[in-house]
């Protein structure tokens, strides 16, 4: 192994893709149990490695030198082999500092809460101290060494909330370390989780009009800092933004909403082909799981039960996917929960096809006649507009709509 990352569980790491964009060097992912880590360090058969949870502290006794920032934090995420000497660094400090600045937060002279008490929490404490936070409090399920409980945290005032726990991380997408509504003084929220692209707590915070950000930019910046140690040469600062945008776009889903018969499935398949992405149709996933057509499910269960089924399928089968094109059912927009789930990794495009270009069909229970279609259009149109990231006029040909979505997504 020339360069790479070691950790216990790394099936969904973004690091290889990021390092491919940084430079022309091989970067390997190696999962291993704790007992295998010492042998890797003793053998020293690498030029440089990143170290991820839960080994950032475990590696430290095996290093010949640890830089001051890593020693202050108490953990190492980058190890470089310099002529047989292992030197440890913590580039998470660089990444988290950049992430806090990116969200627009200024912790100077203000109180902050850190949720979690692991290695990343120690990094957050060091970063917030360097940025001048007036009071830094750790929140833990098992409070000790000055940490407080989650119940006590809800009584504290804080301008910046930093989540360092794995709450909300794939595949546990519907979890959150805290409810931002319980922290009315919060000016910003930083969540170090990077998968999904928008965690539950970040979406909840943004819905309140408060700046919030997940950890992908931190991951990119710390990777660049690690690469500079690996290669002993600087990476131009502008590369961070370019790499961040490339990785985010490659992972982000294109989610299509709109009325029945507006062309979501047809456009979605053509778009997926054009972009070489997998395609998923929410209605097809429902039918596949249920073993019955949607019209039969409506007739047997009623609309309320069908909507429950639809949300369950979105949560279980679609929300965690990345780099896909997803066509939703016409009524998926009715539930805000569906939109939140789909936004975790997706950007939502409303295919706005004029009412006179829509066609009622018997296989669409809520739009089986011209009158029913008109009623649905009038009821749902405001929701389609409110619950999308971009409205795409869809009165033209499939090719024209595909081009419009593609251009909007890549802009």
Give residue spans per PLM region:
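NAD(P)-binding Rossmann-fold cofactor-contacting core
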Residues: 131-147, 283-285, 289
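A glycine- and Lys/Arg-enriched "phosphate-lid" helix/loop adjacent to the NTP-binding pocket
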Residues: 344-383, 390
